[in-house]
Amino acid sequence: MSDLQKFVSDVGFTFIASAVSMLLGFPITVVLGRYLGADDLGLYRMVNTIFGTVMLFVTIGIPAAVIKYVAEFRDNDKKLGQIVSGGLITSILLGLISFIFIYVSASLFAAVFHMPELSGLLKILAFAFPFSVVTGMLFGLLNGLREMTKNAWISIIQSASMLIFTFLLIFNYGVNGAVVGIVFSYVMTTLLLIFVQKIPNLTFSNFSDNAFQLINFGSKTVLSNAINLINYQADILMIGYFMTKTDVGVYSVAVMFAKLIWILPDSIQKITFPLISEYHAKEMNGSIHILVDKCMKYSCLFLVFGTTFFIFFGNRVISLIFGAEFEHSYFPLIILLIGTVLYGITKSVGSIFASVGKVSLVYKIPLISAISNIVLNIVLIPIYGMNGAALATTISLIVSTVVMISFMKTLINIRVDFIWYIKVLFLSGLLICFFLSFKNLINDILLGVILQIIELTLFSVYFISNHDKNKMFHLFSIYVN
């Protein structure tokens, strides 16, 4: 299999896994919103937000470090075994520490966010941490080895198990059952990863050196991820602080749909991180430039198409799935989409600085946007509520995008074809203006469908080169046959 075929295959498997996992996780949000209401959905989202935030710090970036060093030393069995051993043993210790921390601090979190119910939920969630930390490290091993088929299937199984466990428990135990479902799914996923992926015999040879190497690299990515997490989660946390759990539930629906369009760039990034690391180690700079250009452009087409869909049909989709209680999610969604589409263009290659060894830039670049995000949320949420939170997040994402592109051009000599992106955005903007002008004169669903077909056709004809279309057709023919 050629490098191109391998790349397309990996992206395909990862995209399908992400799509299926998202679809499997979607009913949980719908049931919580419809059956239990915005209050309990808000509690569940707060639990998930705290879970993701704490997980970011307790792993100390071990999964990202494992991806990088496994990709670089995949042909050196001895070094590979030492890296895996160092990562696994360290992850087990970190998992136990995180369990104790969350269990003891549960009441404190509940007091900070003025949600007494959080205490019991977090004590349940604490049992997931030892398994979740180890799971993250083992997924990093699969990514580093580019075992994307295994990665995809296990991700799907994890999401399916969470859905099944949640549905079995939620109707009798409410939101408590949903949190227990999280715990059970991570326990099962950890056991499955250990069974499926052959792990080298654990060795303490050079353990301290390898653990230090992993933590040294990983800790630098933690700050970056923490800053990005502020950009992703500060709005929900601050709505939880300034407003109510009901507002958290309503706003979380807008966030969920806004992040839905990141499914493709997120899938691509899982491949580009180890691939760019490998190219950099082999000094294949030309391949890096081509890869970045293609990934960003095709991510852009997908993101813009998805954004257009939600502008046309988002209000109907929210009302149909979640009911009238969540109709106020639509306007924050539109505001958020502006930031998510622009930031998503670079998201597919978001790990490029870590891949080429510019680790310090990984956290320095988003720092400005994180500061602006916090300040803007503090200022805007008390005045404009959910819309203020969405605006603060969008501005911070745009700032992060501008700074990242600037450094990519300056330090890695990545050339961005700005004219191409302007044409895509201008074309879609015209279609959106046409829709808004005539939606009250023509059936809005029919009009939206026609305009999306036109948009898709124009993208295919004018923004995908014949060379790339021929390659795609050739690869598709190979897989079909």
Regions found by a protein language model. Give the residues of each.
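N-terminal membrane topogenesis motif
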Residues: M1-G25, K78-G81, S85, S208-S224, ...
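Signature of the first transmembrane helix
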Residues: K6-I67, G95, F99-Y103, S159-L163, ...
